[in-house]
């Protein structure tokens, strides 16, 4: 992908941001928890979430997609598939399916692309196996392909040492099909799983950082949901509005869950002009986000609620690079094991652009600098590619391996063009 510098300000409303990826994954998976059809509108039709939908179909569900909505009719009982369940590039899909399938009757194999199969899975496999699951794979079940022989667990308690929505969700799904659990975490992680399970009728309660879940005695209620647009995907364009002079963007129908908009709160602390307009609430708070050009962004130190902004960190680094002074992100070691080593890849790419930046073991330091055109390697990481596309609106950018953008945001390049950007996107 080649991006050329913008020659005008951005003044538009964007209503076609990609649907929320986290919610879409869960809509497909959690439809299996009911005995009636779930109806899902605005499902994310991107590589990762379409793979999840395909897996649900292989597990026995009937999928009807009429364009306006997807109707998922669950099987009476999750069936043992006769082929490998391919998760593509999605760690969320693989880790949540590990929990869901660990308590089913049958044999299942989860795999993904070369990037996903190199990512760590022991954080899920180890606690599940300690509770009685039978999960095996390379390097003591740390890498896919993973083999799962379903079994029922006794009731368990688990005190997580990390704030991870994926660890939490996997264990809750396994417990739901077994004998329930108590789960505690050091700080609140993304809570979509708890919200959606409660909305479907599960007996789940939260007391500060502890969750109590009772086993599923009967099927849950089906979903009937309009998936909101993804705040992580919208964040790229929020950063664009902040750094392109005289810009004003309204981002429509965005998920406003507090565990998903922390990166916007960081921008506000840096001096960004951002307004939130809540419009509706069912399973989640939804609304519009209004962002204006903010020429006086100042550096900041960020060390708290990192799990709430982990996906936005590469784009946040672009905002840091365009701010005045030094910014520092710490407690973000999780970035090392995402689709790429996002600390190393982000900092190396910024250096190529002439930005004064350095790695920390658990984050990075960035001094605001004038960026210049560069050819950067995204290392097959969709969020790296999109983040540097946004920087390219200021200084131009050539991005290698940009085809991975399609795993989460198929119409990203089209929105850039609608904004007035000149984009050569043969890879997309």
Swiss-Prot record:
Phosphoenolpyruvate binds at residues 21, 91, 119, 166, 342, 383. Pathway: Metabolic intermediate biosynthesis; chorismate biosynthesis; chorismate from D-erythrose 4-phosphate and phosphoenolpyruvate: step 6/7. The keyword Transferase applies. PROSITE patterns: EPSP_SYNTHASE_1, EPSP_SYNTHASE_2. It is found in: Cytoplasm. GO terms for biological process: amino acid biosynthetic process; aromatic amino acid family biosynthetic process; chorismate biosynthetic process. The active site is at residue 311. Belongs to the EPSP synthase family. Monomer. This is 3-phosphoshikimate 1-carboxyvinyltransferase. It comes from Campylobacter concisus (strain 13826).
